[in-house]
Amino acid sequence: MSDNKERKSQGFPKEDNQDTSSLADAVEKVAKQQQSQASEIEKNKKVLFNLKNELHELEKEIAAISAETKETERQIYQQDSAIENTKLHCDSLETQIKSLHSENVKLKFDIETAQEDFEEHMIKYNAYYAKIKAHKNSLGEVESKWSFMTELHEKRDFVKKLKTMKEELMQDLQNPGGNRITQVQEDITNLKDKIITVKESIIEKTCFLEEEKKTHEKLRKEIEVQHKRYDAILKRLHCQVNKLQSNRRQWQWNIQQLEKTAAELRKCIGMQE
């Protein structure tokens, strides 16, 4: 029995050494786990700090983009006001153009009326000239059918008439104040006055028509220039508005993306905490 006790006493130190070794391993393992967890916590703290900084920067960017969006909306409102003013000005110009067109149509109608009157007078003159010519022809035909005696009597009467007229003319020539010379001079003077009046009227109307043509041509060119200029302004304004609207849509999309990113970052921060 004493031998057994000695053997048992010799076996206890080995078991104690094994327990001590396993305990030390466990302690070392726990220490390593704690160290690893502490290192992981430090990393997570750094990540959390960086995420908070990024979130702060994103909030700053969102605020800046929001301010820029408001400024863009203000510019769009100003552009809309400018477009509205331009439309009003174009409406005013169109009213003026319609008024000028009405005046032009009226003048054209007056010119056409004057042309029609002139043509009517020419038709009447041609008809009168044709009648005179026909009368002369018919008179010639009748005269060609007269007999010799009839022609002789008529020629004698005509010669007598010519002699009488010759005597009257001789008397009128000897008397400067004679009725026939005075009448002829008055007729000549009246004809000259009428010719001068007609010439002056023709010159005046011609000058007036030329001035009207020049005025109409000038107005037409000015209207074309104004139309081209305002068309260019409207096109430029439409391009600017389209560009601003495109930028606005892009900024809204960027804000949405930033808000999504911020929401994801907040979610990550909440999970880390």
UniProtKB/Swiss-Prot annotation:
Bias (Basic and acidic residues): 1-17
Region (Disordered): 1-39
Domain of life: Eukaryota
Any coiled-coil regions, as ranges: 24-116, 179-269
Entry keyword set: Coiled coil
The keyword rRNA-binding is annotated on this UniProt entry: no
Name of the molecule in the record: Coiled-coil domain-containing protein 122
Organism in which the protein naturally occurs: Homo sapiens
